[in-house]
Amino acid sequence: MSYNNPANTKGYLVAPIRYLEYKDFNPDGTLKHFRNKTCLVMVQASFCGHCSSAKPAFQNFARKHPEIVCLTVQGDDPVSDSIDRLVKLISTIKPSFQGYPDYLLFRNGVLVPREIDGRSEADLEKFVR
């Protein structure tokens, strides 16, 4: 897990958002490092136009809510050799995952089976409550 974006280029999310890697998950899809925390994960890709338009709301949400750990999975990470395994894991723990962007909510490291209704800050607020 890192605060640094994979390619260190414009358009990537920045701190306080952290980038997740395959090694940050247990084999059962739970998060390793976030017991007793609420975590919001944006699954996104740099080529995705909808992701690009959703990133500012996610970034603002992360800044306004330090009590929630905001994380991201870069679905087209050019540096990671395990991104395919990570996307497959996400598809396994969230069968409704069909593409980018998508959001995952974890409480105490465990996925909360919930779907988000949109990509705005208000939608993110509603999703985590």
From Swiss-Prot:
Marked site: Contributes to redox potential value: 49-50
Covalent S-S links between cysteines: 48-51
Record carries keyword Transferase: no
The protein's role, per its UniProt record: Participates in various redox reactions through the reversible oxidation of its active center dithiol to a disulfide and catalyzes dithiol-disulfide exchange reactions.
Organism: Invertebrate iridescent virus 3 (IIV-3)
PROSITE patterns linked: THIOREDOXIN_2 (PS51352)
Keyword rRNA-binding: no
Protein's name according to its UniProt entry: Putative thioredoxin-like protein 041R
Family per record: Belongs to the thioredoxin family.
InterPro entries the record matches: Thioredoxin-like_sf (IPR036249), Thioredoxin_domain (IPR013766)
Lineage summary: Viruses, Varidnaviria, Bamfordvirae, Nucleocytoviricota, Megaviricetes
Pfam family, one: Thioredoxin
Superkingdom of source: Viruses
Residue span(s) of domain Thioredoxin: 9-129
Active-site residue list: 48, 51
Keyword annotations: Disulfide bond, Electron transport, Redox-active center, Transport
Cited CDD domains: TRX_family (cd02947)
